[in-house]
């Protein structure tokens, strides 16, 4: 910024004496930008909070209504098969409600920046095998869950539970959207990072929706149970671990969800 002062002005003598003062306002502009960003962040946080409360009101009420409603009907049911159907519906909605509460707690920790990362030595092959064994029992007969052959030996430092959480979310989503075919758990070493992936032969995702699925409360199919928070939480976890997350998909052919992690 330049301020110009006229010290002596005598037009009859064709004299004008000026004083120019140059001010460095770099720090002022930097502070101004910081304040603008802080304001925008606060406004965005307020918007997300309102959206969060509106969505949670609906998401919590849905399984609760099912639990309360079918619990009442269970008392009146006389047929054993009918009772079994009601119990199954109640159990499914209990699981959905528990998952929703778990996601809310994770999300609140992320917002408060208290989302702890506990580093330990992780065996990549063992991690994927544990997931494979746990999810095999939950896979329908029409779908084959696979663990990629000849996985490379790899041990690195990370938060094992958080890595498992991300991979579990990928496999769970793949099972929801794959009615037949196969789902493959894989990882490959690429330079100084490892790339984990879960590939399925499911319904696939439209190109315009692929970026949005990592946004909170975005659900590809409102008829399939889910909170719409899982992938958003996965993105936050992967970012905190120093990696990247993404998806490659083609409608009608399937999807491949992946994330990278630095090897140290």
Predicted regions mapped to residue ranges:
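Short loop/turn elements at sensory-signaling interfaces that couple input to output
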Residues: 2-18
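Sensory beta-strand/linker motifs that couple input domains to effectors
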Residues: 21
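Primarily the dimerization/phosphotransfer
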Residues: 32-74
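Short alpha-helical segment of the dimerization/phosphotransfer core of two-component systems
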Residues: 92-98
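Helix-loop junction within the histidine kinase core
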Residues: 108-119
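Short conserved segment of the HATPase_c
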Residues: 205-217, 257
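Short alpha-helical Gxxx[C/S/T] motif in the catalytic ATP-binding
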Residues: 230, 234
